């Protein structure tokens, strides 16, 4: 054991030295070019490296931290390796190293993970039938990066399902995810104004486009408000949350989250602001607060809907958030969401669905593959089609179908979509069981409630968003750590059988 530790220390020291030399040379060249953005990223990499070294056997914590972020890191040609991809790659290397040192078990958990393995088989078949190169994680046909992302998602699942999480780890993960969402949202907003080429906010399709659009950088606001709102509701019961001791900070924070979400223009996120308290209240059996919350929600929505256009005028982004309710909404908001000439239908998503169905009918079992033909993209840019049609075709080429199930079916076949459906079902069942089993067990319970809400969001959002490759990046790690928690709680329960009851330690849920 001492020899293994000494060898590991030597390997780490050599790796740090070589990495530091390479980083110093690269930073010098960037400084000479005046590339401040890259220098900032290098500084962040140094801080992250120190953080990873100090984690030691808790190296896996870089996964939830990195996956909660969505920032560009290392430039690779004309592409960027995201913080999510970098975090999983680093964790995978450390995982393999620990396996080689006989310090790390591997737990496949086939009873729970079989849908993931079948999904991977469908992905492998798709890649075999339509292989693409791996240059810069994308090749000139643009699709290999998606296959790499799916492989990374599986690696994150495997690592997290093999660990033994403790209560302090779950607390750290929740708080780190909040900071990660805050940093990502802040980066997206700043990038919109300073680095528009590096943000997804500038490419979001909208029928209403002008210099000061009400649905551009505003979208990033819900990335912060919804997780913070859910975190506050998950860490303590409503009875304690609304007590005299906490009401002076809890109510203002919850109201602020509602306002920020309204200003984001995200209708689905606003719906979650009312659904998540319902889920948490039912889980805790706080039926009185459930009734009071329903009355309060009805009052707030009535004031906003009935007062709009009569007593006050809401910001356009807030109107977009509430536009599905009957009210006097601005015509520009209606034009950007309903199309006006299509009887309240979303023209954009309807067209995307029709295109996906065409591919599914032609190739129902294997899909068209996760690839983009460069010649087709150039031809698309050179056509005289309308801007909306170009946007739709470009997003479809990149597998951004705005419908997870149709997208998976079109990309890698209907069987893959069926297996992913089973995965989502097991994911939901797992976190329901975790909520029941971890009831009033401090951060185990808070984490389970928080992630249960996120799982419900994944499922409900699947018909308006999702992606064949990025959805596994978002969801599989949550499944992996959920299985690890479930196994840990089951083991603890078995150990406690037949033993006398001991006094419970302080819990955040009391």
Whereabouts are the PLM-identified features?
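A membrane-periplasm/extracellular boundary helix in multi-pass inner-membrane enzymes
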Residues: 195, 264, 284-340, 354-362, ...
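Hydrophobic transmembrane alpha-helices and their immediate junctions
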Residues: 179, 397, 411-454
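Alpha-helical transmembrane segments of multi-pass inner-membrane proteins
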Residues: 2-26, 44-50, 121-124, 151-159, ...
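Aromatic-anchored transmembrane helix interface
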Residues: 82-92, 114-121, 135-162, 172, ...
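Transmembrane signal-anchor hairpin modules in multi-pass inner-membrane enzymes, especially those
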Residues: 1-129, 165-175, 239-251, 289, ...
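Juxtamembrane membrane-water interface segments that cap and precede transmembrane helices
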Residues: 73, 202-220, 390-408
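Long extracytoplasmic/lumenal interhelical loops at the membrane interface
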Residues: 339-354, 358-412, 431, 435-438
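Transmembrane alpha-helices of multi-pass inner-membrane enzymes
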Residues: 235, 277, 289, 420-430, ...
């Amino acid at each position: 054991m001492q020899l293994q530790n000494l060898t590991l220390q030597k390997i780490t020291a050599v790796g740090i030295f070589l990495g530091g030399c390479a980083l110093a040379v690269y930073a010098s060249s960037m400084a000479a070019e005046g590339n401040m953005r890259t220098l900032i990223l290098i500084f962040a990499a140094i801080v992250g490296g120190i953080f990873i070294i100090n984690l030691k056997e808790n190296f896996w914590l870089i996964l939830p931290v990195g996956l909660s972020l969505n920032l560009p890191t290392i430039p690779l040609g004309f592409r960027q390796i995201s913080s999510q991809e970098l975090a999983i790659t680093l964790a995978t290397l450390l995982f393999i190293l620990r396996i080689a040192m006989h310090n790390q078990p591997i737990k496949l958990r086939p009873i729970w993970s079989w849908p993931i393995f079948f999904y991977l088989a469908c992905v492998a078949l798709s890649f075999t039938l339509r292989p693409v190169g791996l240059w810069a994680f994308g090749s000139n046909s643009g699709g290999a990066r998606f296959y790499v992302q799916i492989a990374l998602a599986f690696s994150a699942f495997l690592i997290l399902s093999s660990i033994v999480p403790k209560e302090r780890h779950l607390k750290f993960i929740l708080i780190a995810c909040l900071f990660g969402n805050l940093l990502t949202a802040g980066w997206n907003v700043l990038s919109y104004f300073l680095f528009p080429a590096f943000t997804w906010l500038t490419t979001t399709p909208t029928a209403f486009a002008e210099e000061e659009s009400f649905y551009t950088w505003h979208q990033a606001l819900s990335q912060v408000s919804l997780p913070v709102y859910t975190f506050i509701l998950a860490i303590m019961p409503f009875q304690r949350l609304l007590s005299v001791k906490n009401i002076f900070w809890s109510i203002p924070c919850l109201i602020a989250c509602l306002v920020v979400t309204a200003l984001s223009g995200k209708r689905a996120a606003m719906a979650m602001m009312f659904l998540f308290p319902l889920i948490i209240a039912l889980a805790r059996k706080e039926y009185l607060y459930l009734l009071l919350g329903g009355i309060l929600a009805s009052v707030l929505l009535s004031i906003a809907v009935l007062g709009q256009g009569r007593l006050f005028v809401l910001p356009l982004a807030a109107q977009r958030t509430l536009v599905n309710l009957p009210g006097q909404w601005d015509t520009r908001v209606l034009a950007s969401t309903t199309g006006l000439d299509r009887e309240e239908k979303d023209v954009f998503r309807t067209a995307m669905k029709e295109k996906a169905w065409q591919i599914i009918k032609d190739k129902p079992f294997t899909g068209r593959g996760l690839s983009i033909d460069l010649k087709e993209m150039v031809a698309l840019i050179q056509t005289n089609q309308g801007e909306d049609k170009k946007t739709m075709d470009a997003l479809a080429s990149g597998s951004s179908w705005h419908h997870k199930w149709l997208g998976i079916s079109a990309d890698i076949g209907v069987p893959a979509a069926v297996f992913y459906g089973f995965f989502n079902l097991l994911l939901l069942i797992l976190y329901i069981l975790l909520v029941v089993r971890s009831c009033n067990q401090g951060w185990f319970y808070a984490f389970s409630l928080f992630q249960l809400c996120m799982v419900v969001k994944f499922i409900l959002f699947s018909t308006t968003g999702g992606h064949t490759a990025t959805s596994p990046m978002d969801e599989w790690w949550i499944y992996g750590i959920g299985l690890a928690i479930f196994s840990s709680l089951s083991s603890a329960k078995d150990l406690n059988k037949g033993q006398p009851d001991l006094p419970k330690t302080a819990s955040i849920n009391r």
